[in-house]
């Protein structure tokens, strides 16, 4: 066996293992760990913290009224809760609708904060948070609808001082659509993993539609970053906890067409190189314990799918050319077939083919994110996906 074959085989096996670990291996390991450790009891507090619910919006005139009606219909003590709409320089009727709602609900503490410049969700949150004096800050999107007890559930999870962040469960309501169903299937599995991570120590990422943090521990991140990924990472690296409460529920529509879902995934990967760099910092199990294991398996290995698929393909081509073994040619054929099925899945009504297609556009979106990072095209703002409203 030549040197190039040996190197190619090592690269192939390593990249395939990381792909397997990202998509199946880590989740399997979590479930094994959970079985061995047993299900830990989740603690809750009865203490009623003062709360501000922040709704972040940019040109959300179609949903902001319904969101306000939804969020004020909660079972939290009225004297302990405030509402704040952080408008990211909305240019439609969003601000006017909110102002009119405030006039018609003078018995409630509702305020509107407007950013002078359109610099994205995180910037609007950073600016609006400066006016918050509550103990707990709940943050949510304009198109995510809460259950009546969602705020209470989020707040009840702050049972210990080391818990700085709580993420709720996002449920999709339009799973009859192929694209939405693919996202929902992935998300259901994701929530199981978060639940296990949370019980053991801490989660590695949240969800921008439904989460809360201690206001005193709010971190001002650069506008290009998002709280979903940055907050749990920050707290985890500082030995604090970000946890998941499956009973704090929000409902939302998933993207119903590939274009909307692809744009969302590209946006999610706008700082993918930073995430990979952060993963390297977290890769110290002696210092960070369980968080190090969780972050590598749940985040870093997934952030590396784009390069591992490329390495697996290139090394497989080399092995198929230089090796006499038919095995490598069969594996290469299987890889090519996989991508062909992914292309066919775009128009197919087959759930399996569409899942393969959905996976392929996820990898493509990572490449797009890498391109934007390198060329400086990554930006903190985006246009909302109309199919999610």
What is the meaning of each model-derived region?
Residues 4-5, 32, 44-45, 252, ...:
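Membrane-embedded multi-pass helical conduit in multi-pass membrane proteins
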Residues 87-96, 117, 144:
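A conserved acidic beta->alpha catalytic loop
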Residues 69-80:
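Short, acidic, metal-binding catalytic loop of nucleotide-sugar glycosyltransferases
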Residues 113-114, 122-124, 134, 148-225, ...:
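Long helical/loop segments within the catalytic core of UDP-sugar-dependent glycosyltransferases
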Residues 158-189, 223, 227-296, 361-364, ...:
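Catalytic donor/gating beta->alpha subdomain of glycosyltransferases that bind UDP-sugars
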Residues 49-52, 82, 230:
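Cell-envelope/extracellular polymer assembly enzymes that use nucleotide-activated donors
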Residues 137:
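Short aromatic/hydrophobic "clamp" motif used to bind/position activated sugar donors
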Residues 1-45:
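N-terminal membrane-anchoring/stem segments of glycan-assembly enzymes
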